[in-house]
């Protein structure tokens, strides 16, 4: 019986066809020439952030100090988010407290006056150098440069001129770190990023002590910057500062920081995403500056024909004679360079066979400006600051310039809210607690119920107003928001001018009374006509005419205030 021969399978029939699916054909492609050698690794926030913090801070600090664009980014954000300081506006919840709106306004007015007495005094600073509003500027700039900053609550005896004991001490990020060579700590793992407190078993991550749940328990603060080569007085010592008081639950130290990842305990410098680009911009700018300086030089070369004598015989040896070389004094150079000069109407006679040629240092048109503008746009996009605002160059139309301001203002307002939550509001609550405890401010039920305490402590913080390109349009928009119930006069006054609406009303009433007393009348007709003309112009203005108005607006900066 013949055996049946097995039929061979066609070649390649058993091979399964591989097809790209999902991201394997895009960002996860392993065969692309661009991506096949690119294998970045994302690890924990400790590995990605804390391990690189020291070099990030050093480089970001250098960029913020020594590069124009880096300094512009930090200074612009600080100036617009904080400026001269955020101002307190108490907003106690009178319905929860069971008091009338009039009583609530009177209490708020009293608290603002009392708080400003403490905040405007340099006694609120433990160093007695800055008031509370100046400390805001310092803390915010340190937060941008280093990624986070800290403020310690300190106490000093009240005096006749300062009835409060609360003091603030602002610290930079490098003052909070792991306590190296300390008796009650031990290294943990292979990196000094994380250590362990042997007293309670808590972990210490870059100076932040956390419990088993990951909650912050304490901060380790050094008495000076570790490894400082100038401040060598005494040894570096660390002190453990509990994050919150065990009896009151109030913070003992504030960390100004905005987290971007889960399980993050330290902040990332503001300039971290653009450090490399800023460095390249700085190098490119320096090279172009050196090239521009070289172009201003005017160089001359003496040349000789083939039949003339040696060039050394013509000009002499500019470096003098060599050691041991005999010099024939009678054989002087034919051309004394010191006798020839350039000037208007100057005529110089050169020996036979000697010629002068000028070197033109100019080259082709440089692409410096367009290339630099593109790099600055990338930097601005990463920092959420349009390039027009970053460079203070408003060369486009009014609409484009205002759009850039509005985009930047969204960034500034967000950072202002973060900063007020981390710094201003906790400081106000600590101050108000002392004011109520000492009897300078009356707040019934403040220490009895957390809900009541929160109702008394509720507040808003307003800072510098957004720059205005066309005051007429902005005031008209503000008027319409109030008219349709989208905002209040008090909020508009605070956001547009940083002023208090009730103070404005009192001053206006006084001015009108004084004008009537002196027989001066207001030109209401002129004001109404101007407002009507502005409204008609906005309704009938075409896009083409709008662009012409925009150009005139930018040419006449007196009509608006730029950043």
Go through each PLM region and give its residues:
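Extended, helix-rich architectural segments
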Residues: 1-146, 153-166
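Activation/maturation switch segments at domain boundaries
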Residues: 2-5, 354-358, 364-365, 405, ...
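Surface-exposed loop-to-helix/strand elements on domain peripheries
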Residues: 105, 122, 126-128, 343-469
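Short coil/turn segments at secondary-structure boundaries
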Residues: 130, 153-155, 292-297, 390-394, ...
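Extended, Lys/Arg-enriched charged tracts that mediate electrostatic binding to polyanionic substrates
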Residues: 137-231
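Acidic/polar, glycine-anchored loop/turn motif associated with catalytic or activation segments
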Residues: 214, 379, 492
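Short, surface-exposed, low-complexity cationic segments
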Residues: 223-245
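Extended, charged amphipathic alpha-helical segments
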Residues: 246-401, 531
């Amino acid at each position: 019986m013949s055996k049946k021969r097995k039929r061979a399978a066609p070649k390649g029939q058993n091979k399964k066809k591989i097809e790209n699916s999902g991201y394997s054909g895009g960002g996860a492609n392993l065969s692309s020439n661009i991506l096949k050698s690119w294998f970045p690794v994302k690890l924990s926030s400790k590995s990605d952030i804390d391990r690189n913090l020291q070099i990030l801070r050093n480089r970001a600090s250098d960029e913020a100090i020594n590069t124009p664009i880096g300094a512009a980014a930090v200074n612009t954000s600080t100036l617009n988010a904080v400026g001269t300081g955020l101002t307190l506006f108490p907003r106690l919840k009178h319905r929860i407290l069971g008091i009338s709106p009039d009583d609530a306004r009177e209490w708020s007015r009293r608290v603002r006056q009392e708080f400003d007495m403490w905040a405007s005094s340099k006694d609120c600073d433990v160093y007695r150098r800055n008031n509370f509003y100046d400390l805001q500027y310092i803390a915010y700039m340190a937060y941008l440069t280093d990624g986070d900053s800290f403020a310690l609550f300190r106490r000093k005896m009240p005096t006749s001129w300062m009835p409060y004991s609360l003091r603030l001490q602002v610290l930079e990020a490098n003052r909070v770190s792991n306590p190296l060579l300390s008796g009650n700590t031990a290294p943990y793992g292979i990196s000094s990023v994380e250590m362990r407190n042997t007293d309670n078993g808590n972990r210490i991550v870059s100076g932040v002590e956390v419990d088993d749940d990951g909650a912050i328990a304490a901060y380790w603060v050094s008495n000076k910057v570790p490894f400082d080569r100038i401040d060598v007085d005494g040894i570096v010592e660390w002190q453990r500062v509990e994050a919150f008081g065990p009896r009151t639950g109030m913070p003992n130290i504030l960390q100004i920081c905005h987290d971007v990842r889960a399980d993050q305990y330290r902040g990332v410098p503001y300039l971290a995403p653009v450090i490399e680009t800023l460095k390249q911009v700085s190098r490119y700018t320096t090279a172009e500056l050196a090239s521009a300086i070289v172009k201003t030089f005017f160089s001359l070369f003496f040349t000789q024909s083939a039949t003339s004598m040696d060039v050394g015989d013509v000009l002499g040896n500019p470096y003098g004679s060599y050691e041991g070389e005999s010099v024939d004094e009678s054989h002087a150079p034919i051309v004394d360079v010191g006798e020839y000069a350039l000037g208007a109407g100057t005529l110089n006679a050169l020996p036979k066979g000697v010629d002068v040629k000028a070197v033109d240092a100019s080259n082709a048109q440089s692409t410096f400006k367009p290339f630099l503008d593109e790099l600055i746009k990338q930097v601005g996009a990463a920092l959420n600051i349009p390039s027009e605002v970053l460079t203070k160059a408003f060369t486009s139309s009014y609409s484009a310039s205002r759009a850039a301001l509005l985009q930047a203002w969204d960034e500034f307002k967000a950072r202002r809210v973060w900063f007020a939550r981390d710094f201003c509001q906790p400081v106000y609550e600590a101050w108000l607690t002392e004011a109520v405890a000492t009897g300078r401010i009356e707040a019934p039920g403040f220490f009895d119920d957390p809900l009541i305490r929160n109702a008394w402590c509720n507040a808003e913080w307003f800072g510098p107003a957004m720059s205005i390109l066309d005051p007429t349009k902005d005031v008209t928009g503000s008027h319409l928001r109030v008219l349709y119930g989208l905002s209040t006069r008090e909020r508009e006054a605070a956001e547009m001018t940083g002023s208090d609406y009730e103070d404005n009303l009192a001053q206006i009433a006084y001015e009108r009374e004084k004008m009537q007393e002196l027989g001066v009348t207001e030109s209401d007709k002129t004001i109404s006509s101007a407002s009507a003309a502005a409204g008609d112009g906005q309704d009938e203005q075409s896009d083409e005419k709008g662009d012409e108005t925009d150009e005139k607006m930018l040419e006449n900066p007196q009509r608006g205030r730029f950043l």
